[in-house]
């Protein structure tokens, strides 16, 4: 199942999620609203324990319980142009821009943990589009949406070698 770390502002869960304070916020604790494809959305802040719990509950209820056993964490680059976005890391308020790889890692870990809890007797297999050091513990990655061409093969080979040097053997 392909899932994203952003919740559209038109999503039925959005208003309740704002009240639960699970999003990346500005200095005034208001959710940052970003352009997300052709809609607007807010990004879930996986440095917040309540956001991780919210995520895992939704993944379990709406995805895993419907028979899916693999989570594809997509669009988790956390490309925030908003410079006033803040997250909480180790009880300190920090600019989210400094935690971008961590957000992807924590999202992927939250998905992997929910899957492992729901399916304790199968080996977890997850996919992620983004992530930093340690991501290979929770999911494999892929090098993006390619086309069938020599050009794509050339760049995919280079990217694959770089990923392998970073400890990511599946790409």
Where are these regions (language model features)?
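Catalytic-domain carbohydrate-binding cleft regions of carbohydrate-active enzymes
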Residues: 1-171
């Amino acid at each position: 199942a392909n899932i994203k770390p952003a919740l559209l502002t038109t999503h039925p869960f959005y208003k309740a999620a704002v009240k639960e304070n699970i999003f990346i916020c500005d200095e005034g604790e208001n959710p940052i609203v970003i352009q997300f494809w052709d809609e607007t959305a807010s990004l879930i802040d996986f440095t917040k324990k309540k956001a991780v719990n919210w995520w895992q509950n939704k993944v379990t209820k709406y995805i895993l319980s419907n028979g899916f056993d693999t989570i594809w964490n997509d669009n988790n680059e956390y490309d925030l142009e908003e410079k006033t976005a803040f997250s909480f890391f180790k009880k300190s308020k920090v600019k989210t821009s400094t935690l971008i790889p961590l957000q992807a890692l924590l999202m992927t870990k939250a998905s992997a943990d929910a899957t492992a809890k729901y399916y304790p007797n199968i080996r977890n297999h997850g996919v992620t589009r983004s992530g930093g050091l340690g991501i290979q513990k929770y999911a494999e990655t892929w090098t993006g949406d390619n086309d069938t061409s020599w050009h794509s093969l050339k760049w995919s080979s280079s990217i694959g070698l770089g990923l392998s040097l970073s400890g990511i053997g599946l790409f």
